[in-house]
Regions:
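Phosphate-backbone binding interfaces of nucleic-acid-interacting proteins
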Residues: 1-148
Length: 148
């Protein structure tokens, strides 16, 4: 068992070895205003937010915007979700990532393909240009983990 002093020294050394946090300047970033309409808790609670792992991702033929994701949602059955984010991401850079999806939306056909859910992203404007970032979480979170 380590002495309390030795444990403190190790903690201090580990803290000194970590890289300083890079500060990001958000002063030129514009975000959409918050919704004024309230959603009751029961309605919100019906949405099933899950961690999903990207098994495959490809551009949808004849579409400039759509990417087709093949996802592991923890059920053992692949889930397909389409997302109009090709302007922001190349398909190959998303394979292996852990994303957040709403999994209990009814299927919606796009370009003849059923999309079974929605991937969550954040959108803002920076220097007059729209930016989009998929919500990605730590890869240690297993596919199918429920978010509360």
């Amino acid at each position: 068992m380590k002495s309390q002093g030795a444990a403190k020294n190790e903690a201090n050394n580990a803290a000194q070895e970590t890289k300083p946090v890079e500060k990001i300047d958000f002063s030129k970033v514009k975000v959409e205003p918050l919704f004024e309409e309230m959603v009751d808790f029961d309605t919100f609670s019906k949405s099933d937010f899950r961690a999903v792992k990207v098994k495959a991702c490809e551009a949808v033929k004849k579409s400039e915007k759509l990417l087709q994701f093949t996802l592991d949602d923890g059920t053992g059955i692949d889930r397909t979700i389409l997302s109009g984010i090709h302007a922001y991401y190349e398909p190959e850079e998303l394979v292996g990532k852990t994303l957040i999806a709403i999994t209990n939306l009814p299927p919606r056909a796009m370009m003849g393909i059923d999309s079974c859910g929605m991937l969550l992203s954040a959108i803002h404007e920076e220097e007059g240009e729209e930016k989009l970032h998929l919500l990605m979480v730590d890869d240690h979170i297993p596919a199918g983990a429920k978010l509360y």
